[in-house]
Amino acid sequence: MAAGVEAAAEVAATEPKMEEESGAPCVPSGNGAPGPKGEERPTQNEKRKEKNIKRGGNRFEPYSNPTKRYRAFITNIPFDVKWQSLKDLVKEKVGEVTYVELLMDAEGKSRGCAVVEFKMEESMKKAAEVLNKHSLSGRPLKVKEDPDGEHARRAMQKVMATTGGMGMGPGGPGMINIPPSILNNPNIPNEIIHALQAGRLGSTVFVANLDYKVGWKKLKEVFSMAGVVVRADILEDKDGKSRGIGIVTFEQSIEAVQAISMFNGQLLFDRPMHVKMDERALPKGDFFPPERPQQLPHGLGGIGMGLGPGGQPIDANHLSKGIGMGNLGPAGMGMEGIGFGINKIGGMEGPFGGGMENMGRFGSGMNMGRINEILSNALKRGEIIAKQGGGGAGGSVPGIERMGPGIDRISGAGMERMGAGLGHGMDRVGSEIERMGLVMDRMGSVERMGSSIERMGPLGLDHMASSIERMGQTMERIGSGVERMGAGMGFGLERMAAPIDRVGQTIERMGSGVERMGPAIERMGLSMDRMVPTGMGASLERMGPVMDRMATGLERMGANNLERMGLERMGANSLERMGLERMGANSLERMGPAMGPALGAGIERMGLAMGGAGGASFDRAIEMERGNFGGSFAGSFGGAGGHAPGVARKACQIFVRNLPFDFTWKMLKDKFNECGHVLYADIKMENGKSKGCGVVKFESPEVAERACRMMNGMKLSGREIDVRIDRNA
């Protein structure tokens, strides 16, 4: 409340200046001496300040001194009790009540505790005596005197620490998931972020220093770029002229915070706007936990920025273990969950588990330097093996012949354990992948892949091409041994029927887990959208000549050699007995509705139009909406000879889904005119009725992309629309 009083006084102090600038009548005094009216002027200003102070809050304040309050803190309240019922109970048992606030969580549910204020100290003491241990809906209330708000503050801190909020350093995730772009934004005060996390922030912003010709329509037009504006007002003086002050109310609190970030300090008609939260939108009461600065060692004056996101320090020990993204979220919520979760998917505690741990390394801060080192070592080993291929291949044929009996033994206890492992592991796939989706939301460091991949150019891929050429020659000498291997695999697979039968049953249980993958994969799509920086183009261009040489090597490995591998022995009788029919119908059909829309949304946002390939390696060119994929890279992937299409032309048309069915093309055009000049708008119709989707064409790709950023997720008549670039335009 003290903050509200100061804000009201500040606004009142600026009002005379506004009136003078707008040409409001001012009382002059001759020869610089204060006249009789001039002597009354300070008294009038003081009265105006007092009036504004009384009017400052949206609740009745019974105390002249706002720091002196007679409050009681009540806990163990049944969760279904509303604040009005609690107020009636206290009024009946104690007497007059001036203020009741039931503490709520982010979803609007009661936390089981409340703050009750009284006008007199005797009422506060009586409440602690009478209501303590009073049974309400079978639960004994716990009532304590709390004049300084200390009990309420501790309760809030305890609740927020349980949910991962305060006490975890700046940026810790609170009761509402706040994007890092807001947490680390210097334009937004910390108290506003804390109130937003607690779900106790209003949706109204206060705008000052407006040009006097700005009306409410212009104000609404400007601030609509930050969100859905419910109401916009310009404050006027007694003559009906603008005072250069406005108030804008949004549909959601986060839109108001976004407006502060977007417009505070920006010029409107050559005047910088001052945008802040309206004092009535800030949370009431002083029991909200204040921000506590990080405790520093004695004698240390301060610290600079760490190397992690948002200036957070990183843990070097975690980096060496491959979990460097542990500090990605400002509260230490990181990517180690991915490596750990994937490692548990199939109960893979054996050799597979060791391999899957590398997923944690890849996710950890996109540690591309480590990948470079691994690839370099692998390529060197491949080159050495290929150089020995002339004599070594001949020696390896008897070894491959001896693989047949070994493969027979694979299908016994090993395959049965695999079935059991899959059964336990697949049940956890859904929850683990959900955690992957949440973490991918925070993968702001994916944008650094471009610069990291650029370092992969001179990795020694030339050695890889020459090695593959030698592998082609070696494969020609392996044929007879592989034939016998095929025979052994045929017998082995016949014994795999029973374990695979059990795999079919476990995959049926995957349905519910995969259904939870939808939102996660959609969030992964948003992150993947940032994975095509310009740095990737320059590095991949260097791979063009190398890929040409790899094509000739791959040709030598195909056709004749693979035909001699005896794989036909694996078909018919053995595969028919594998129980794969259990994997259809009930299980895989449930995977379709969950993965279909989600994968569609995620892959479309990746901006990749992947084709096949032609000539020696692939048939069609890779089309990428973003990135500089020209030159030799396009030539190698575009087939032998000629230049591939390379960069796809950016589209100027967007596709809008989930529109209200009463929305017309004119309404659609008017709505998207806020983003830029619309050339064409249309609603898709079927049998004369709207299909709930439409297209909008702009004059440039940049305007189309801006429309996607501004309008995607906006609510129209209660429906959240989906806006994306129309690839088919």
UniProtKB/Swiss-Prot annotation:
<feature type="repeat" description="7">
    <location>
        <begin position="445"/>
        <end position="450"/>
    </location>
</feature>
<dbReference type="InterPro" id="IPR035979">
    <property type="entry name" value="RBD_domain_sf"/>
</dbReference>
<keyword id="KW-0694">RNA-binding</keyword>
<feature type="cross-link" description="Glycyl lysine isopeptide (Lys-Gly) (interchain with G-Cter in SUMO2); alternate">
    <location>
        <position position="133"/>
    </location>
</feature>
<feature type="repeat" description="24">
    <location>
        <begin position="574"/>
        <end position="579"/>
    </location>
</feature>
<protein>
    <recommendedName>
        <fullName>Heterogeneous nuclear ribonucleoprotein M</fullName>
    </recommendedName>
</protein>
<feature type="cross-link" description="Glycyl lysine isopeptide (Lys-Gly) (interchain with G-Cter in SUMO2)">
    <location>
        <position position="144"/>
    </location>
</feature>
<feature type="cross-link" description="Glycyl lysine isopeptide (Lys-Gly) (interchain with G-Cter in SUMO2)">
    <location>
        <position position="284"/>
    </location>
</feature>
<feature type="modified residue" description="N6-acetyllysine">
    <location>
        <position position="671"/>
    </location>
</feature>
<feature type="modified residue" description="Phosphoserine">
    <location>
        <position position="527"/>
    </location>
</feature>
<feature type="modified residue" description="N-acetylalanine">
    <location>
        <position position="2"/>
    </location>
</feature>
<feature type="cross-link" description="Glycyl lysine isopeptide (Lys-Gly) (interchain with G-Cter in SUMO2)">
    <location>
        <position position="126"/>
    </location>
</feature>
<feature type="repeat" description="10">
    <location>
        <begin position="467"/>
        <end position="472"/>
    </location>
</feature>
<feature type="modified residue" description="Phosphoserine">
    <location>
        <position position="587"/>
    </location>
</feature>
<keyword id="KW-0539">Nucleus</keyword>
<keyword id="KW-0677">Repeat</keyword>
<keyword id="KW-0007">Acetylation</keyword>
<dbReference type="InterPro" id="IPR000504">
    <property type="entry name" value="RRM_dom"/>
</dbReference>
<feature type="modified residue" description="Phosphoserine">
    <location>
        <position position="574"/>
    </location>
</feature>
<feature type="modified residue" description="Phosphoserine">
    <location>
        <position position="364"/>
    </location>
</feature>
<feature type="region of interest" description="27 X 6 AA repeats of [GEVSTPAN]-[ILMV]-[DE]-[RH]-[MLVI]-[GAV]">
    <location>
        <begin position="399"/>
        <end position="607"/>
    </location>
</feature>
<feature type="repeat" description="6">
    <location>
        <begin position="439"/>
        <end position="444"/>
    </location>
</feature>
<feature type="modified residue" description="Phosphothreonine">
    <location>
        <position position="664"/>
    </location>
</feature>
<feature type="modified residue" description="Phosphoserine">
    <location>
        <position position="396"/>
    </location>
</feature>
<feature type="repeat" description="3">
    <location>
        <begin position="414"/>
        <end position="419"/>
    </location>
</feature>
<dbReference type="GO" id="GO:0042382">
    <property type="term" value="C:paraspeckles"/>
</dbReference>
<keyword id="KW-0597">Phosphoprotein</keyword>
<keyword id="KW-0508">mRNA splicing</keyword>
<feature type="repeat" description="26">
    <location>
        <begin position="587"/>
        <end position="592"/>
    </location>
</feature>
<feature type="repeat" description="19">
    <location>
        <begin position="539"/>
        <end position="544"/>
    </location>
</feature>
<keyword id="KW-0687">Ribonucleoprotein</keyword>
<feature type="cross-link" description="Glycyl lysine isopeptide (Lys-Gly) (interchain with G-Cter in SUMO2)">
    <location>
        <position position="82"/>
    </location>
</feature>
<feature type="repeat" description="23">
    <location>
        <begin position="567"/>
        <end position="571"/>
    </location>
</feature>
<feature type="repeat" description="1">
    <location>
        <begin position="399"/>
        <end position="404"/>
    </location>
</feature>
<feature type="cross-link" description="Glycyl lysine isopeptide (Lys-Gly) (interchain with G-Cter in SUMO2)">
    <location>
        <position position="87"/>
    </location>
</feature>
<feature type="cross-link" description="Glycyl lysine isopeptide (Lys-Gly) (interchain with G-Cter in SUMO2)">
    <location>
        <position position="666"/>
    </location>
</feature>
<feature type="repeat" description="8">
    <location>
        <begin position="452"/>
        <end position="457"/>
    </location>
</feature>
<feature type="modified residue" description="N6-acetyllysine; alternate">
    <location>
        <position position="276"/>
    </location>
</feature>
<feature type="modified residue" description="Phosphoserine">
    <location>
        <position position="203"/>
    </location>
</feature>
<feature type="cross-link" description="Glycyl lysine isopeptide (Lys-Gly) (interchain with G-Cter in SUMO2)">
    <location>
        <position position="220"/>
    </location>
</feature>
<feature type="cross-link" description="Glycyl lysine isopeptide (Lys-Gly) (interchain with G-Cter in SUMO2)">
    <location>
        <position position="17"/>
    </location>
</feature>
<keyword id="KW-0747">Spliceosome</keyword>
